[in-house]
Amino acid sequence: MSKLSVCFIGFFGIKQQHVNKYIDLWNNLNASTNYYKYSSYKDIFTSSNHKTTRELFEPKKNHYDIVHCISGGSLYLHLLLTAKKTFTYSKIIYDSGPYTFDHKQTEIYIHQTYPITKFLSVKNILSAMNENEMLKLKEEHKNNLYTPHEKLVLTSKLDKTIDRDFVMKYIDKSGAKHTEFSKGQHANLYLTNKEEYTQSLVDFIKK
């Protein structure tokens, strides 16, 4: 039996030790994994970085059986899929996502990461700064989200960082399979629910 090929994109600031846990997980499921790394939050939300990524990106493979994104990694995936050179895929997994370029999602993330900003209307500030710049990006991303690929969304009832209203509507509209865990914080679902998480992947692979 040939190995599955997996494209893995982690969350903002993911450490190599965490990446290795997911690579080991896929190895145990008879899959080879390519990890696509981005440097920082600025790679996602700075237009000059977008341009550089889209111009210079070189995919490690032309096609992947599965793309596995965690949290904001789904935004970096969008940039890769709109680069001059890119890859195709058959199935996609959104762990603690999918994220969007919408200001509401950005505000939720900033408030969770930097609690002091809860006293500021980050959403309004962002809208005033770059609304025109983000309109095209949002539309492009929407087109990538609603492709006919098979989808699996993994969430936790305890996760307060995702835009839950959007994610639930996305699951319904896209027909994605959904597994919700009773425990586990944002972008940390596997380490808290190893057996259930692994079984969700196995079921999705066999689908």
Region spans (language model):
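Glycine-rich nucleophile elbow surrounding the catalytic serine of serine-hydrolase chemistry
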Residues: 69-80
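Conserved alpha/beta-hydrolase "acid-adjacent" motif
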Residues: 17, 160-166
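Catalytic nucleophile-loop/oxyanion-hole region of alpha/beta-hydrolase
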Residues: 39-61
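Short, surface-exposed "cap/lid" segments of acyl-processing enzymes
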Residues: 2-42
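Short glycine-rich catalytic loops that host catalytic nucleophiles or stabilize transition states
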Residues: 36-39, 179-185
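Catalytic histidine-centered segment of alpha/beta-hydrolase-like enzymes
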Residues: 44-46, 184-198
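The alpha/beta-hydrolase serine catalytic core
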Residues: 87-151, 158
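Acidic catalytic loop of the alpha/beta-hydrolase fold
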Residues: 158-162, 187-188
